[in-house]
A protein has these predicted regions:
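Amphipathic alpha-helical segments that line or abut small-molecule/effector binding pockets
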Residues: 78-96, 140, 144, 174, ...
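Helical hydrophobic small-molecule/effector-binding pocket
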Residues: 81-103, 110-117, 147-151
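C-terminal peripheral helix-coil segments that are non-catalytic and often amphipathic
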Residues: 126-130, 163-212
Length: 212
């Protein structure tokens, strides 16, 4: 009878996750996970055939942690803003996990930034429709455009450090959300990407000149 494993599968995954949190997915090797646990590499391969299996479990753990942030944001009085702020906090507090989920080309089409965006979109659609009085199509367009803003800010956080304070980024999210909401409500063709650019800018600039 083989000796009883000293560590559980979950403890091995957690050790690998801690490595990913500080040094990234590429740092997860059998030797480094074993060192984190203070054992030889043998216990790892009691549960896993390859280290790629370990990395897949770490990816799933990172997704769960991200999902917890989104769920927390949805409890905010303004759910969409709450989700945006939690997204930025995730990038700020878990930069390596953010890189894994959103800045690394996925091997699986069901993973990566676009898949995460669609999943989050499904989570917040109802609250956007309710809060901003939008149809599902309008809410999805609002979410897509705001996601691009949040993703850009989060990427700056991860790649350039503390470029903006959380208060500054919260204000940016508010400003962009107001602009996008107004465009959806007032700009003909915005939702369908069929804006008459010249006519719309003439209208905007005409209003501006008329107000001076």
């Amino acid at each position: 009878m083989p000796p009883k494993a000293k560590f559980t599968k979950e403890e091995i995954i957690d050790a690998a996750l801690q490595i990913a949190r500080t040094r990234g997915m590429e740092a997860i090797t059998a030797r480094d996970v074993a060192a984190q646990l203070g054992v030889s590499t043998r216990p790892i391969f009691t549960y896993f055939s390859t280290m790629e299996e370990v990395r897949r479990e770490v990816y799933a753990s990172a997704e769960r942690l991200y999902g917890e942030r989104i769920a927390r944001g949805l409890q905010n009085r303004r759910p969409f803003l709450g989700v945006g702020v939690e997204y930025l906090r995730f990038a700020q507090e878990e930069p390596q996990l953010y890189r894994i989920l959103f800045l690394t080309r996925p091997a699986d089409a069901n993973e990566g930034a676009i898949a995460a965006m669609r999943s989050t979109q499904n989570e917040v659609r109802a609250s956007v429709m309710r809060e901003y009085k939008m149809t599902a199509r309008e809410a999805d367009r609002f979410f897509r455009d705001m996601w691009i803003v949040a993703h850009g800010l989060a990427t700056l956080l991860v790649t350039n450090g503390e470029c903006y304070s959380m208060d500054e980024m919260r204000a940016m999210l508010t400003g962009f959300s107001a602009s996008i909401c107004r465009s959806i409500k007032e700009v003909a063709g915005y939702v369908d990407d069929k804006i008459d650019r010249d006519a719309e800018f003439a209208r905007i600039l005409g209003k501006s000149e008329g107000g001076e």
